[in-house]
Structure formats: structure tokens, C-alpha cells
């Protein structure tokens, strides 16, 4: 029998005022001296209120200016001789992604303190950047702890919460793609990781009629789902449970520089399209339910809402069929033509 070591977040706190748990988490990680990474806005809104909480600890604070590998390298160089016990990232995706890379490079524990709930990077072992306008993903160590305080996150723009909903819902089509790869090309499949990723997404979709993402109980559901999505990725050491053809579509939009959508908004549109294909060819998609659930939370369901034309959507879909060919998805299984994509975006109302 073979065994594999899996690194997962050791502490996860989600709720109101859980930022008060930060000293406890730091002590449990023997982090007497740490690096706190944040940005200018969060520093003035959130970090300024942590001074009393952190009065018994020694720490340095640096500001993250951009979501780039070069930014992470600069911080590593500046802090390379400090011998930090931990890196505490307080902020949105930009800060958390840089914090993951810095903590991995410095061989220090990472504590994720999100101020938004816009995607599953809160707890995942993946950092996403744009280099020369192109998206890249970097494998990192997962956070050792996640502290998601509802009193902080509820103040982020509602668009970012809807984006997080879109990213979580995309797991439904991602897992279907993984199952296709298992059935058609014999890819390894992990039922536990798949369930961890897809069950919270299915729960949110089933409750879309009553969801108000600004209410603490519903925001709690969203955060749990996004954190579990990150844990599923860490569990198998791959983004497979949470990234399928819908993410290829989003990456294609990023490569082409089209539109003004967030990551979650782009993958949500991609999910509607890929669910249509799953339903048409394999009878196990439900694009109408996905679209309806996105509409219920007022997330975009059309290209126009995120600054895309029909032609740009089709071009991105065609490019998506050429990206990451080793990741088998519905696109590799059915090889849609441009004409079919045109039919799909019309039938679904995406464009």
C-alpha cells in the first residue's frame, strides 16, 4: 500500500470577529516573528486595527503593490535574511497570491486573512499572476491557517462576492470534466476531492432562490465553499477538482485581453456554456439551473455584462480548445466547431 503526505490548512476559522484568533494561531505555529503583507487600502481599513491584537508579537509589514512574480521576488529579497516564522497575508487575491509565493520561498508558514471572497484562492496551494498580460499559475504550499472574518469580508464590494459565487459554481462543470477524463482516457480520479469541491457548489445552487450574499449566514456558506474548493485542490495537489473547460475559456479571455470581467464572472459564463455541452452530449449537465442561480444572485450571465462581444466570446472559445491540451475536458471529448459554439452561445443566451 502506498501512502502520500497531504498538506492542508491546519487552522480554519470562519465567522464574526474571528480575527481575534490570530494570536492563538500564531502561537500554535511558533510564529514569534513574522512578515505581514497587505496593501495600502487594507492597511488603512483593517491592519490599523490589528495593532493591539498583535502587540505581543514582533513583525515587519510590507505593502504588496502588484500581483506579479516580480513583486514576490522583491519581497523575498527584502526579507530573505530576517528568518521569519510565518507570513501573514491580509487582503484580497493580489496580496494572498504574493503571500503564498513569499512564504513558500522563505520556507515559512502562511496565514491567509482574506478581505474578499472573490475566488477559491483563499485556501488553495496555487498563486495566479499575469506576466506580460498573460495568466500564469504557480504551485505553492497551501496556507497553514485561514482566518475569514465576516465582519471584514462583508464590507467588500458585492460584485466580488458574486464573483466568488461564480468561481464556486464552476466546480460543478470542473468535476464533470474530471469524471469524463476518468471514463474516457483513464485519468486518476479522487472521489473525496471531487466531493469536497462539488458539494458546496451544488448546495449554493440549490438555495439560490433564498440567497443574499450580504447576509452573514449566506456569506458563511460561500466562504466555506471557497475554502473547501481550495482544500480539494491541496488534497490532490492539482487544480483538477476546481478547474476544467470553463477555466480554459477564462484563461483564453485573459490571453486575448478581452472584456472587463473578474475571474469568477468569466468562469461562470464558461460554466453555462460547458454545462450545455455536457447536457447535449452526455445528458448530465444543467445549464439552465446554473444560469438561473447566477441570475438569482445578480451575477453576470451574458457576455455584454462583462464587456464582451459575441465575436470575442467565440474567439475565446476556439482558443480554449487549444489551451492545456493535457487537461482532458468536454472540449477534448466532443471537439466543438466554431459553428457549434455559435449555436451554444445563442441557445444559452450568453451572447
UniProtKB/Swiss-Prot annotation:
Keyword terms, alphabetized: Cytoplasm, Lipid biosynthesis, Lipid metabolism, Metal-binding, NAD, NADP, Oxidoreductase, Phospholipid biosynthesis, Phospholipid metabolism, Zinc
Listed pathway(s): Membrane lipid metabolism; glycerophospholipid metabolism
Enzyme nomenclature, EC number: 1.1.1.261
One Pfam family here: Fe-ADH_2
Chain sites annotated for binding substrate: 120, 167, 251
Gene Ontology molecular functions: glycerol-1-phosphate dehydrogenase (NAD+) activity; glycerol-1-phosphate dehydrogenase (NADP+) activity; metal ion binding
GO biological process: glycerophospholipid metabolic process; phospholipid biosynthetic process
Cofactor(s) essential for the protein: Zn(2+)
SUPFAM superfamilies referenced in this protein's UniProt entry, alphabetically: Dehydroquinate synthase-like (SSF56796)
Positions of Zn(2+) binding: 167, 247, 263
GO CC field: cytoplasm
UniProt-listed HAMAP family: G1P_dehydrogenase_A (MF_00497_A)
Protein family per UniProt: Belongs to the glycerol-1-phosphate dehydrogenase family.
Protein's name in the database: Glycerol-1-phosphate dehydrogenase [NAD(P)+]
Organism whose genome encodes this protein: Archaeoglobus fulgidus (strain ATCC 49558 / DSM 4304 / JCM 9628 / NBRC 100126 / VC-16)
Higher taxonomy: Archaea, Methanobacteriati, Methanobacteriota, Archaeoglobi, Archaeoglobales
